[in-house]
Design a protein with these regions (language model features):
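Residues lining hydrophobic/aromatic ligand-binding pockets adjacent to catalytic sites
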Residues: 1-137
Length: 137
């Protein structure tokens, strides 16, 4: 509350943040993250289906596990945040028939959290902002 109290859209966004924290029990960080992702996505009109990776084989780790998940979903492209560019080898994905791309936001505010952006820009502007991106290799 103190960090965002002076932001332009605080009065509109903060009640939603309170809802997220009040609805969620102490079961796990990943469960809370999924709750937040779904709730904020709904508010922004994002209809992408999300799934837990728990149901997939845990035989591999890291990049190999992502490739396994992509293959089991018959995905021909994997998109990651641009901050992960140094983590993955595009050639390894390519050899499995999967394009590896990174999402580069048009606003160049890659260091800000979604809460930072919502507090500064509000739901409507953020909804438009998330549509402005470039997929890079």
């Amino acid at each position: 509350r103190y960090a965002y109290g002076k932001e332009k859209h605080f009065d509109d966004i903060y009640p939603h943040i309170e809802i997220l924290f009040s609805r969620h029990g102490p079961d796990s960080v990943s469960s809370f993250a999924m709750t937040c992702l779904t709730y904020i996505g709904d508010q922004l009109g994002i209809t992408t289906k999300t799934r837990w990776s728990l149901g997939y084989s845990k035989e591999n780790k890291g990049q190999e596990r992502l490739i396994d998940i992509c293959k089991s979903e018959k995905a021909d492209m994997y998109i990651n945040a641009i901050g992960g560019k140094e983590l993955y080898n595009p050639d390894d994905f390519y050899l499995e028939g999967i394009e590896l791309r990174f999402i580069k936001r048009a606003d160049n505010e890659n260091d800000l959290s979604i809460i930072d952006i919502l507090m500064r820009r509000g739901w409507e502007e953020t909804s438009e902002l998330v549509k402005q991106y470039e997929l890079v290799e």
